[in-house]
Every structure is written in structure tokens, then in C-alpha cells.
Amino acid sequence: MEQKFTTLAQDALSDAVQSAAAAGNAQVDTLHLADALLRQEQGVVRALIAQTGADAQQIGAEIRNALVALPSSTGSTTTKPDASRQLLAALSQAEKEMHAMGDEYVSTEHMLIGIVASAPNAVADIFKKHNVSADALRKAVPTVRGGAKVTSPDAEGNYKALEKYSVDMTARAREGKLDPVSYTHLTLPTS
């Protein structure tokens, strides 16, 4: 199974491995990946969680607390940590989510849904406590993406590009934030 990951998804996996190694954890777990996803500044995971009505900061704090509680080895180890069974199951589920959504690359949204959908794992338990299910996350994806599909490695940066780089003049007019422009000095020629 050849998986193609977006740049942000690759970064999250790399950060998860580095985090596990730095903490002396023997395995990279769903907790490490979820923490890496939530720490991404330009990522969409926090927006996805917010769309479900949950508090991404609170969930992130609970994930970090759970990470601290993981067993760690002391001393210097030169081997990098292995992926846990839960992480492998979550990544497999993420690939299924990618295919189900008609996308070409595994993105950070797929990873988060994969983690929550591949319960039981510590992250899924935290999300369940906050009433966030895989179905709720799936329903939030179109809103966060603005209807876009993941067709390139940099797809997450392109979501809602129109909203990022333009001004909705109609919305500004409704809010009374536009100055009315009068064209009464112009006369149209009549024949």
C-alpha cells in the first residue's frame, strides 16, 4: 500500500517521531501524532475540531498531559521509536478516509479522522470525552476545505484560497462597512 501524504501530513509524522524520541518513548503513538497535528500553525486540524463545537486548546492540553504519562526510557538510545499498533491502524484508516473522500493524498484531516475512528486509543477517548466523533469530523471537512479536494501535496494551503486573498464585498455591504458611492454626477447619454 503506497501512501501519498501531503506536506503537512509528512511534517506531522516527522514531528511525532521526533517528539517520541525526545521523550524517550519506545513507540510513536496516536498521542504523538495528534499532538503534532494540533501544534501545526498553518494546519487545518484545529479549525476542523472547532467546526464540531469542541475546544481544540483543551483537547490539546489533555493530549499533552497523556503524553507526559507515557512510559519513557532513560539513558541515551540511538534507535528511533517504532510505530505503535494504534498508530498503524490510524494511518490505515486515514488512507481509507482519503479514498472515501475522493482525494489523491492523505492529508492532516484524514489522519485526525483516522485516529478518532480507529478507537480504542487514548486520543479517541479524549475526543469522545469532548463529544467529537469521527462522523462529526467527517461532516466538518467540506466546510473547512471550502469544497476542495486533496489533489496535491500542498492542498491544505489552498483551502478557501478565495476567502484568504479576496474581500467579500457583498458581506461588507451587509455589515455596513462600505462607503456608499454616488454616481449621480454621471449622466448616461439618451437617444
Report each predicted region and the residues it spans:
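Short "domain-exit" segments at the C-terminal end of structured domains
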Residues: T187-S191
